[in-house]
Amino acid sequence: EAYVPEGVLVPEWVRLSVEAVAFVAREDRRVDQTAGVSQRLAISLLEVVAASAERRALLHGGRPVARPLDLYQGLPAITGKLELEYEGELQGAERVAREIVQRAFGLVLPRYRLRTEPIVAHFEEGNLLTLPEGDVEEALKAMAGVPGLLEAARALAEGEAPEVLLSAGEFVLEGLVGRRKLSRGEASYQAAERPRSYGN
């Protein structure tokens, strides 16, 4: 059982995505399946996610709520539990782990049956979304500029605190990336068919 510090909230969509990481890793041909995927992968990842949420709350204030982006803080916890095949070694462990996380979000998103067409259409018009670090209200304000995004997030968060709403909105975006409806650079979300830009 993963240790989650008292007071840290891990929303269902984050918890399910953590569990899905282990499932996706077991299906990924770049992962050495003869070595197996450790049962501890999901436990280690959830502990990193919870610690990341706690650290953010200490730095910026607000409630300690786990967000999808916290899973990327856990990439070392994933790479440390995977043995890679030759192809995976060529691509690099971090890239493989990052893609596994994205596919995990994409796997979990459909279970919520959210209306995401307006969100995808917004990005297909050439718009980008960059979420500011730390400031929950500013990030929600940025999300409000994407038609349908906060509505989808509210359907998940059901009137919870702003931190939970932000976590839900991030999950919708990451789920769409995982389903290849959007792409994600280092700092921003954009339409899937645009080439990814890692230098900005």
Sequence positions of predicted segments:
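Conserved AAA+ ATPase small/helical "lid" subdomain
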Residues: 1-65
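C-terminal engagement/docking regions of AAA+ P-loop ATPases
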Residues: 54-200
